[in-house]
Amino acid sequence: EPTFADAGPISRNCVGTPGAGKISEGATVTIGSIFTLRDTVLRCNGEVIYYSPTKKTEETNHQPIAENVANFQVRYLLQSNDAANPTTLYANADDVNNNWNQVQGVEVCLVLFGTERIDMPTDDPDLTSYTDCDGTRVDMTALTGNRTNRMHYVFRNVFQLRSQGLI
């Protein structure tokens, strides 16, 4: 028969907090993950706010989670509440405004680049370019600095947040 050390909530932010046993009975918790890209390092700032009947406690931890990141973008998928003609559109956080109840999904795009320079073909631009998170074409031979002539990989995924969405 399995035994469990803690029967508490399993919700965690991007740095793994709050840990087991950190949430006391009767407390309310807000858990957040804030991602930032500085230079070529993707960082996570995990925050937890504990609300108990007598006090509010905030805990913040940050750490790098990936290196050699050329681009990191998050877009939200908003779906209108029009049952006859539902429409879905992409928006960044500023454009969502007060329409968070219409957010049905989130698209995460991450561009990583290699650590070694590689020989790039010179006769076919299709072999030396990729489509960036914003849809623009990027030629790897025209990049400057530590990204020049390095392989770039684009990872893009859409995560559905609400089951009634049409995405």
Residue locations for each model-derived region?
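Extracytoplasmic beta-strand-rich oligomerization domains located immediately C-terminal to a leader/signal peptide
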Residues: 1-61, 66-67, 88, 161
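Short linear sequence signals and composition-biased patches located at protein termini or domain-edge surfaces
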Residues: 26-29, 50-167
